[in-house]
Amino acid sequence: NGSFGETIDTIYTAHNKSASFPRISPDNQYLLFTESDYATFPIWHKEADLKMISLQGSAPVDTDILNSTDVESYHSWSSNGRWIIFSSRRLDGLYTRFFIAHLNKNGKFSKPFLLPQKDPDENNLRMKSFNIPELSRIKSQSPDLSWIIP
């Protein structure tokens, strides 16, 4: 009959908006995603915010502390599920910078902080827009060896 199943399970309804970049926490407790008015590239949508639901019943989790009046978009979980890194244009509305926030055992986020740089002026001088942060447990270094992350 051309159908895949008899029921459709919906864990979140975006209410005439778009939900993009869904990522489940490593402990399978939460689903974090970006919600915007439309489309699938929310880094260009000022209204884009991070949203999260509990996967133990689909209840929304308060993410207000993560969001600003500008764009919050792509995000990544730490391997232990207690930290996230995400892209935001909250500082100037023009350039994307990475922010980090902690998620406690009760599902409450801490206030996000700007990803530290070896030279703090780098956050003001950088003219490129980085959109897709990923947390990794693998050692990284730049091709010219100007930075190394152990």
Language-model regions, residue ranges each:
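Sequence signature of WD/YWTD-type beta-propeller architectures
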Residues: 1-150
